[in-house]
Amino acid sequence: MSEAYFPVESGALGPEENFLSLDDILMSQEKLPVRVETPMPRLGAFFLERGAGSEPDHPLPQGTKLELPLWLAKGLFDHKRRILSVELPKMYQEGWRTVFSADANVVDLHKMGPHFYGFGSQLLHFDSPENADISQSLLKTFIGRFRRIMDSSQNSYNEDTSALVARLDETERGLFQIGQRSLNDFQSWEKGQASQITASSLVQNYKKRKFTNMED
């Protein structure tokens, strides 16, 4: 089946999201718990409940705790002025990092957050003292789950994989689909339904990047 739109690569695992990517747009809408460190003029009506100082000109007072979408929290965050501080979502805190380090494969990552790796990478934008631990946890979690994901994608031809896929975050689902497509292409070639085996898109993109680096 053809895709409904031309897929755009996510930038969430890098320093900034790619707002031409639907996955990044959805990820940037996920809520992040924050604490207001500097009163914000005329924002009380937007964020406070009715009757709690929500007049049009009422400021958002210092110490207010609320949840903001990631894109807004990043826009308001300032290292020098300290407009707001960010509280780590529970799945990135030390307790869950310990669980991931013990056996990341037992965790339903999609339930924890459909954009677990992308959202976690964007948390590094904020000056948490736990940033180094978060980045290491994300990397080790990905490595710990990668082999099982790819093994499953290569050994489930014409099988129901819905239970497995339901536990994967969106990045992992993309990898699983790549593995499934490669398996299906190989099976088609083996049955004589394809004229030749071609390099995967990952290999082709790697060669392009390598050639570009050589030119530079």
UniProtKB/Swiss-Prot annotation:
Domain of life: Eukaryota
Subunit structure: Component of the GINS complex which is a heterotetramer of GINS1, GINS2, GINS3 and GINS4. Forms a stable subcomplex with GINS2. GINS complex interacts with DNA primase in vitro. Component of the CMG helicase complex, a hexameric ring of related MCM2-7 subunits stabilized by CDC45 and the tetrameric GINS complex.
Annotated organism of origin: Mus musculus (Mouse)
Keyword check for Nucleus: yes
Region annotation (Not essential for folding and stability of GINS complex, but may regulate accessibility to the central complex pore) ranges: 1-16
Function: Required for correct functioning of the GINS complex, a complex that plays an essential role in the initiation of DNA replication, and progression of DNA replication forks. GINS complex is a core component of CDC45-MCM-GINS (CMG) helicase, the molecular machine that unwinds template DNA during replication, and around which the replisome is built.
Gene3D superfamilies for the chain: 1.20.58.2050
This protein's name: DNA replication complex GINS protein PSF3
Protein family according to the UniProt entry: Belongs to the GINS3/PSF3 family.
Keywords recorded for this protein, A-Z: Chromosome, DNA replication, Nucleus
Gene: Gins3
Location(s), subcellular: Nucleus; Chromosome
InterPro entries given in the database record: GINS_A, GINS_bundle-like_dom_sf, GINS_Psf3, GINS_Psf3_sf, PSF3_N
BP-aspect Gene Ontology terms: cellular senescence; DNA replication; multicellular organism growth
Record flagged with keyword Transmembrane: no
One GO cellular component term: CMG complex
Classification via CDD domains: GINS_A_psf3, GINS_B_Psf3
One Pfam family this sequence matches: Sld5
